[in-house]
Amino acid sequence: MGTLLALVVGAALVSSAWGGCVEVDSETEAVYGMTFKILCISCKRRSETTAETFTEWTFRQKGTEEFVKILRYENEVLQLEEDERFEGRVVWNGSRGTKDLQDLSIFITNVTYNHSGDYECHVYRLLFFENYEHNTSVVKKIHIEVVDKANRDMASIVSEIMMYVLIVVLTIWLVAEMVYCYKKIAAATEAAAQENASEYLAITSESKENCTGVQVAE
């Protein structure tokens, strides 16, 4: 049990140490008329490296062939292209207050069927090193389908089941630990009581012998 606890704690520490930036895939099913978040996360390989980043998003509507630019975000300024499909519907939801963008996500409000298609999140990053600078670029591709109502995918169902299984396992483990500790404390208490009783009997016996010796001497 102690080994299991050590493994759990160790995993938590590792997770927290690497938890500064985690690349997560976006959801791909948007509900008509609702607000939908398209995730785009691009982590630096070395967090201590200074960098400046900007992004451009492009979109290819379902049934068409060409990608068109819908926005650019640079120096904390969101520049939207003139496009009726996205007019008044795009909201920046990525990193703020920094030029070193790692979360480049957006919201699309009041989703319509015209928003079904392929999105590309282009990430352009300039890395500053001691003696030189280095440009990198990454493209995150996301395919979005717009549906009438939300459908739970298999991944979310499995995740929920695993969560409940984990809760049950941890509860059983906690109860077992409590029972184990209780038995250990009870055994230690009983041993201490027996030891005290033995000492008391030994002292009583010795006192009687001393008293008998005194009487004989008299």
Swiss-Prot record:
It is found in: Cell membrane; Perikaryon; Cell projection; Cell projection, Axon. Gene3D superfamilies: Immunoglobulins. Keywords: Cell membrane, Cell projection, Disulfide bond, Glycoprotein, Immunoglobulin domain, Ion transport, Membrane, Signal, Sodium, Sodium transport, Transmembrane, Transmembrane helix, Transport. Residues 1-18 form the signal peptide. It comes from the Eukaryota. The chain crosses the membrane at residues 158-179. GO terms for cellular component: axon; perikaryon; plasma membrane; voltage-gated sodium channel complex. Disulfide bonds join 21-43, 40-121. It is a single-pass type I membrane protein. It holds the Pfam family V-set. Its main location: membrane. One of its GO terms (biological process) is sodium ion transport. Residues 19-157 are extracellular. Residues 22-150 form the Ig-like C2-type domain. Glycans are attached at residues 93, 110, 114, 135. Residues 180-218 are cytoplasmic. InterPro entries: Ig-like_dom_sf, Ig-like_fold, Ig_V-set, Na_channel_b1/b3. GO terms for molecular function: sodium channel regulator activity. Belongs to the sodium channel auxiliary subunit SCN1B (TC 8.A.17) family. Regulatory subunit of multiple voltage-gated sodium (Nav) channels directly mediating the depolarization of excitable membranes. Navs, also called VGSCs (voltage-gated sodium channels) or VDSCs (voltage-dependent sodium channels), operate by switching between closed and open conformations depending on the voltage difference across the membrane. In the open conformation they allow Na(+) ions to selectively pass through the pore, along their electrochemical gradient. A voltage-gated sodium (Nav) channel consists of an ion-conducting pore-forming alpha subunit functional on its own that is regulated by one or more beta subunits. Interacts with SCN1A; regulatory subunit of SCN1A/Nav1.1. Interacts with SCN3A; regulatory subunit of SCN3A/Nav1.3. Interacts with SCN4A; regulatory subunit of SCN4A/Nav1.4. Interacts with SCN5A; regulatory subunit of SCN5A/Nav1.5. Interacts with SCN8A; regulatory subunit of SCN8A/Nav1.6. Interacts with SCN9A; regulatory subunit of SCN9A/Nav1.7. Interacts with SCN10A; regulatory subunit of SCN10A/Nav1.8. Interacts with NFASC. This is Sodium channel regulatory subunit beta-1. It comes from Canis lupus familiaris (Dog). The gene is SCN1B.
